[in-house]
Amino acid sequence: MGGFTSIWHWVIVLLVIVLLFGAKKIPELAKGLGSGIKNFKKAVKDDEEEAKNELKTLDAQATQTKVHETSEIKSKQES
């Protein structure tokens, strides 16, 4: 009982799907599933790019703050 390793398991699953949805509906379901997967991947990619851009912005802000603090310290020491 190693799961769905037998070809007969897959044949039965496909037969049940055809009986439930009909042969005409299966291409529409596959198209919808493919479209959903494509949209999901695009959303994940967009989120990753947004996170990278945010990280770059935060890093730049931290660098500017550090430079500003360093220049303030130097000006106080010179006074």
UniProtKB/Swiss-Prot annotation:
Subcellular location: Cell inner membrane
Keyword field contains Membrane: yes
GO process annotations (BP): protein transport by the Tat complex
Main location: membrane
Pfam families: TatA_B_E
This protein's UniProt keywords: Cell inner membrane, Cell membrane, Membrane, Protein transport, Translocation, Transmembrane, Transmembrane helix, Transport
One GO cellular component term noted in the UniProt record for this chain: TAT protein transport complex
Region described as Disordered: 54-79
Segments traversing the membrane: 1-21
Bias (Basic and acidic residues) ranges: 66-79
One GO MF term: protein transmembrane transporter activity
Mode of membrane association: Single-pass membrane protein
Subunit structure: The Tat system comprises two distinct complexes: a TatABC complex, containing multiple copies of TatA, TatB and TatC subunits, and a separate TatA complex, containing only TatA subunits. Substrates initially bind to the TatABC complex, which probably triggers association of the separate TatA complex to form the active translocon.
The protein's role, per its UniProt record: Part of the twin-arginine translocation (Tat) system that transports large folded proteins containing a characteristic twin-arginine motif in their signal peptide across membranes. TatA could form the protein-conducting channel of the Tat system.
Family: Belongs to the TatA/E family.
Protein name: Sec-independent protein translocase protein TatA
Gene designation per UniProt: tatA
